[in-house]
Amino acid sequence: MDGLPGRALGAACLLLLAAGWLGPEAWGSPTPPPTPAAPPPPPPPGSPGGSQDTCTSCGGFRRPEELGRVDGDFLEAVKRHILSRLQMRGRPNITHAVPKAAMVTALRKLHAGKVREDGRVEIPHLDGHASPGADGQERVSEIISFAETDGLASSRVRLYFFISNEGNQNLFVVQASLWLYLKLLPYVLEKGSRRKVRVKVYFQEQGHGDRWNMVEKRVDLKRSGWHTFPLTEAIQALFERGERRLNLDVQCDSCQELAVVPVFVDPGEESHRPFVVVQARLGDSRHRIRKRGLECDGRTNLCCRQQFFIDFRLIGWNDWIIAPTGYYGNYCEGSCPAYLAGVPGSASSFHTAVVNQYRMRGLNPGTVNSCCIPTKLSTMSMLYFDDEYNIVKRDVPNMIVEECGCA
């Protein structure tokens, strides 16, 4: 994982970053990196939070005035951290936006989202805070992909979707569905009767590019509306083949006779563009920490959690991150007296690994003092565009610092 430039971290803290446990927003430090908005004042010289000697194992950490453009460096480190957690090499190149009508329709169907007066999408639980109930549960990634069309394939309509597997080669598809809008045109029916049609969705069989399987559904229609068709098997086969393009052929029996129109890719019907939703399970380790840490309130110099918020609009990322609007990049700061050392939990084990590395290098571990570092990290839900203009809803683990401790 990327962190601050090498000049800003000592060997011990670099080891913690390499372990994938400490994020750039969560550095243990005697002096915290300043924040973009309302940064806390630097600790006075000689205070527990202001001395470099307080945390010898992070001895490479420099005071803000020694780093020059620390604000820019810090924001770049946060950007790299977010991209790393999303398993992306760089931010997506958004050259043309998905039609907002199509996006909003999909989000409303799946997340009960709404559009604010300023045009931004607001979705419950995607506010930059930790995801409720996410820790200790299975991680599930959700991908929304909108249809494109190759035109007609005999009597069927060919749709295709580019579906990203989120950088994970071993995703297990929990559920996947095609959402298709069926529109009713004026038609004379007997009172109380409905229009009954049969929709067939064809997808390529695994291992046989020239053979197609079919999902069939009989639909009784009283009004225009959305209908779903299961595609779990098709998407799982796609991932197992290592492919990204999903080809679907759609056929509707009796639609023409009964004045039923499946809406495909029509510039005049963007809010009804077909889309595929994939829910896939992510295997990720879970951390359970027992001890609750202090909040920085300006009245203590002991190890505590400092909160701050980064608005994605201010760093130019609001074009590809739909929700949340920003990131709570909390970090740890403060002194670690001897009586606070050895907080139980993952932090202790990582600190032990660092000390062992010092021993291997012939250094005296007795000179390595405790560092104020994260002891609990939580999950954050994000909704964003990937390079293929899929809308991805993902619960990203270890994103937000919840508690700090000494180790």
From Swiss-Prot:
Molecular function GO terms recorded: cytokine activity; growth factor activity; hormone activity; host cell surface receptor binding; protein homodimerization activity
Subcellular location, principal: secreted
Coiled coil location: none
S-S bridge residues: 296-304, 303-372, 332-404, 336-406
A Gene Ontology cellular-component term: extracellular space
Region (Disordered) residue spans: 26-62
Residues making up the signal peptide according to the UniProt record: 1-28
Keywords on record: Cleavage on pair of basic residues, Disulfide bond, Glycoprotein, Growth factor, Hormone, Secreted, Signal
Proregion positions: 29-292
PANTHER family hit by this protein: INHIBIN BETA B CHAIN, TGF-BETA FAMILY
Similarity comment: family membership: Belongs to the TGF-beta family.
Function in brief: Inhibins and activins inhibit and activate, respectively, the secretion of follitropin by the pituitary gland. Inhibins/activins are involved in regulating a number of diverse functions such as hypothalamic and pituitary hormone secretion, gonadal hormone secretion, germ cell development and maturation, erythroid differentiation, insulin secretion, nerve cell survival, embryonic axial development or bone growth, depending on their subunit composition. Inhibins appear to oppose the functions of activins.
The protein, known as: Inhibin beta B chain
Lineage: Eukaryota, Metazoa, Chordata, Craniata, Vertebrata
Gene responsible for this protein: INHBB
